[in-house]
Amino acid sequence: MAVKTLKDLLDEGVDGRHVIVRSDFNVPLNDDREITDKGRIIASLPTLKALSEGGAKVIVMAHLGRPKGEVNEKYSLAPVAEALSDELGQYVALAADVVGEDAHERANGLTEGDILLLENVRFDPRETSKDEAERTAFAQELAALAADNGAFVSDGFGVVHRAQTSVYDIAKLLPHYAGGLVETEISVLEKIAESPEAPYVVVLGGSKVSDKIGVIEALAAKADKIIVGGGMCYTFLAAQGHNVQQSLLQEEMKATCTDLLARFGDKIVLPVDLVAASEFNKDAEKQIVDLDSIPEGWMSLDIGPESVKNFGEVLSTAKTIFWNGPMGVFEFAAFSEGTRGIAQAIIDATAGNDAFSVVGGGDSAASVRVLGLNEDGFSHISTGGGASLEYLEGKELPGVAILAQ
């Protein structure tokens, strides 16, 4: 990827310069607005530290949730500013707005090494506008915060697949660089997209088949096996004629699954047993059942132990592994064993078979942390779920493509 990097910017010198950084702080919060997974914040620290230590006046942009272009306290970045201050060991101020009076005053008042976090960029409807003129106007207002001799660093890999103002349009207005996180993510994904060592095993979970069709099509030619679990497996099982009862089912995708099984049946590996639940509840009654024995009115919320064993055997011989999506409702302890078992099998293959393993962001990355698994047991945990999938599908990522211009 022929783009300028953070190292190039630091070599040019940042002392006294305003540097605007797009980070990805779209982190999960509980009802008390406490961050439940700091993974994305931790991943952003090296770039922010390097710029601060280089004497830059750092202005950070990010979004949280979907406030739909309106100021909404529920989506304020206040918890993020607090977490950044704790993790960096220095005060990170939060502007009261995005490009308003407070943001300008604070940006103008920065001294070398200071870090300012702008309020949620999605509080401004122009951030996600389909109208290029609106996005350009917003980008100009953001770029103005950098004054003369400013620079833009793209370090939010989880958003580079979106052509939005703070990711894409601003890069047209300032000298632009890939942050350390974006650079690492792209190099890892290039490795598995272009030259994966065989056997290459892809593990797909998550709720919707429709979200993963593109990646199955794209990877079927390269992968030796595609393991399918999670909510999406029930549409495949239904396509094979199994009665999945009240399990998550995309009826309109059954024909597509039938077609995929006809073409890639030798590669697609499905569960052989399930963990059925009486209702969608962490305290639901549960049973381990074979594929046609889900009690009437019940639903499956996880893959069963035989499936974990089968999938583990496939993974044990792999040299390259890409995992995106949990195997079940891991947030409920009673239905987390499938995800835990697969994650552990990937960790074991990484250590025992020297496999190159990538966790493709999103819920799979969250599950590793929620279940207390060893994050260092994987070769790489991506911060971008949708972005990593789109990259592997062969789609252009606007936020990366613009950096090459």
UniProtKB/Swiss-Prot annotation:
Keyword line: ATP-binding, Cytoplasm, Glycolysis, Kinase, Nucleotide-binding, Transferase
Reactions that this protein is recorded to catalyse: (2R)-3-phosphoglycerate + ATP = (2R)-3-phospho-glyceroyl phosphate + ADP
Annotated Pfam families: PGK (PF00162)
InterPro entries documented for this protein: Phosphoglycerate_kinase, Phosphoglycerate_kinase_CS, Phosphoglycerate_kinase_N, Phosphoglycerate_kinase_sf
Binding site for ATP: 212, 331, 361-364
GO cellular component, one term: cytosol
Gene3D superfamilies to which the protein is assigned, alphabetical: Phosphoglycerate kinase, N-terminal domain
Main location: cytoplasm
EC number: 2.7.2.3
Binding site for substrate: 24-26, 40, 63-66, 122, 162
Pathway in which this enzyme or protein is active: Carbohydrate degradation; glycolysis; pyruvate from D-glyceraldehyde 3-phosphate: step 2/5
Top-level enzyme category: transferase
Family, as annotated: Belongs to the phosphoglycerate kinase family.
One annotated GO biological process: gluconeogenesis
One example GO MF annotation: ADP binding
Location relative to the cell: Cytoplasm
Self-association state and partner proteins as the record states: Monomer.
Name of this protein: Phosphoglycerate kinase
Source organism (scientific name): Corynebacterium glutamicum (strain ATCC 13032 / DSM 20300 / JCM 1318 / BCRC 11384 / CCUG 27702 / LMG 3730 / NBRC 12168 / NCIMB 10025 / NRRL B-2784 / 534)
Top-level lineage group: Bacteria
